[in-house]
């Protein structure tokens, strides 16, 4: 018997949208059927057509008439924080679950290794994947905060300039706000701060992340180390290139962890781990929601949410 698949649409045919499309094509329970853009000449739409995916260059409005006809139940938005609210409203009204890869953060934050099961149980109609820096670093903040209270969490995400598209560059302020908010809300730090560094070095450098946590009490080295290694294993289930470079290094009440993220090389080269962790997390999230839909435990209702 053939496994039934949940049909999906992707909005935004840029770096992230194209990489995500390649991952979804390998999924046992997700089937990408539409790619939505705004430029009929875009390389992303052309590539999608060559892969046998239906395309529209009329934005989300060009997709709406086909949502019911093609049975679309999940949409991924890889456009910009500025347009996400309207995209989400239009698709939620038709009973489509939205996975938000922009920093808009209309729906609850989702970091699969930390809180995916909780978000699936809540049956949210819009979940936000935070940012690439958030996906790479928040698991480490959470790994420390589940051992003991963290008064301050600071993350620095360093990414190759070549891997950062125009959408991300336009959203730098939203990136820092959304990531620092999620360091607090999902990571468990009482106060969070996020910094992104776009490195123009050639050849391009792999994504690197530095995480600093200030603990309220004296750090417990053995427990923190065990928690960090357990969390890394969880992230590696969907991002195999997630690696500890150094740490946890403890200096007074400061716990520092140094990570690197290598991508699978689906669309962009392996140095673009910042894209890979975002698209892999989004695909993992959608698969868990799809399992609930297929099992009949989550029924998508039209106009389930008004944004």
From Swiss-Prot:
The lineage of its organism: Bacteria, Pseudomonadati, Pseudomonadota, Betaproteobacteria, Burkholderiales. The keyword Transcription does not apply. Keywords: Aromatic hydrocarbons catabolism, NAD, Oxidoreductase. InterPro entries: Acetaldehyde_dehydrogenase (IPR003361), Acetylaldehyde_DH_C (IPR015426), NAD(P)-bd_dom_sf (IPR036291), Semialdehyde_DH_NAD-bd (IPR000534). The active site is at 132 (acyl-thioester intermediate). It is an enzyme of class 1 (oxidoreductase). The keyword Plastid does not apply. It catalyses: acetaldehyde + NAD(+) + CoA = acetyl-CoA + NADH + H(+). This is Acetaldehyde dehydrogenase 1. NAD(+) binds at residues 163-171, 274. GO terms for biological process: catabolic process. It comes from the Bacteria. Pfam families: AcetDehyd-dimer. Its EC number is 1.2.1.10. GO terms for molecular function: acetaldehyde dehydrogenase (acetylating) activity; NAD binding. Belongs to the acetaldehyde dehydrogenase family.
């Amino acid at each position: 018997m053939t496994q039934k698949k949940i049909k999906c649409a992707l909005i935004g045919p840029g770096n992230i949208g194209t990489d995500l499309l390649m991952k979804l094509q390998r999924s046992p329970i997700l089937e990408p059927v539409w790619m939505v853009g705004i430029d009929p000449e875009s390389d992303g739409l052309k590539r999608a057509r060559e892969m046998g995916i239906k395309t529209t260059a009329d934005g989300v409005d060009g997709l709406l008439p086909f949502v019911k006809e093609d049975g679309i139940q999940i949409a991924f938005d890889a456009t910009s924080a500025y347009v996400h609210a309207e995209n989400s409203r239009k698709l939620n009204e038709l009973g489509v679950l939205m996975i938000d890869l922009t920093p808009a953060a209309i729906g609850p934050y989702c970091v699969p290794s930390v809180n995916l099961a909780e978000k699936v149980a809540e049956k949210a109609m819009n979940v936000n994947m935070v940012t690439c820096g958030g996906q790479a670093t928040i698991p480490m903040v959470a790994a420390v905060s589940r051992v003991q209270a963290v008064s301050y969490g600071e993350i620095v995400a360093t990414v190759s300039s070549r891997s950062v598209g125009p959408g991300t560059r336009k959203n730098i302020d939203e990136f820092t706000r959304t990531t620092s908010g999620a360091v607090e809300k999902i990571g468990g730090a009482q106060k969070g701060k996020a910094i992104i560094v776009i490195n123009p070095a050639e050849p391009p450098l792999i994504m690197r992340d530095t995480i600093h946590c200030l603990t309220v009490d004296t750090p417990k080295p053995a427990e923190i180390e065990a928690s960090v290694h357990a969390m890394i294993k969880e992230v590696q289930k969907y991002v195999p290139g997630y690696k500890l470079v150094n740490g946890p290094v403890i200096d007074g009440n400061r716990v520092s962890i140094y990570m690197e993220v290598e991508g699978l090389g689906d669309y962009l080269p392996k140095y673009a781990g910042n894209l890979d962790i975002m698209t892999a997390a989004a695909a993992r999230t959608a698969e868990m929601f799809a399992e609930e839909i297929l099992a009949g435990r989550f029924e998508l209702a039209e106009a389930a949410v008004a944004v």
